[in-house]
Amino acid sequence: MNTQIALMLAQDGVVTGAVYALMALALVLVFSVTRVILIAQGEFVTYAALSMAAIQAGALPAIIWLLMALALLVLLVELWRQARGLPVDWRSTLLWTVLLPALAALLAWGVKPQNVWGQMLTAIVLVTPMGPLLYRLVFRPLAHASVLFLLIVSVALHWVMVGLGLYFFGA
C-alpha cells in the first residue's frame, strides 16, 4: 500500500463515518421528539440517492409520484379531521402538502437543473417532505401507542418503503 491508497482509504473512512454519525444523530433526534424508532430512515437516503441518479441521467425521478400521492392522502386526512371537528394546522399542512410538492414538481419537470448543486437541491426537495407526510399519515394517529408498537409500525413502514422503492426505481 502506498501513500495515495492510504489517503484514499482514510478519506473514504472519514466520509463513511460522517454518514453513519449523521444517520445516528437523525435517529436520536427523531426518537427524542416523536418516540418513534424510525427504521425506515435509510430509505429516505436511498430515495434521495436514486433520485439524484435519475436527475443526472436526465430522467424524471419516479419518486415524485409517491410524493404527490402522499401529499394528497395527507390533505384528505386533514380535511377529514377538520370535518370531525379536530383542530388542523393549515399553515404547516399546506406547506407540506401543496407548497413543497409543487416546488419539487417545478424543479423536476420545469427547471431540470444542469449543475450538481441544483440537482442536489431537487433531490432534497423531492425526498424531504416525505418524512413529515409519513409521520402525519402513519405515526400521528398512533401518538399514544407504546414505543414497542411504534417500533413494529416503523418496521412495517420500512418494508413498505423498500417495496415502493423497488417499484419506482426498479431492482
State each model region's role.
Residues 1-34, 39-171:
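Small-residue-rich transmembrane alpha-helical segments that form helix-helix packing/gating elements
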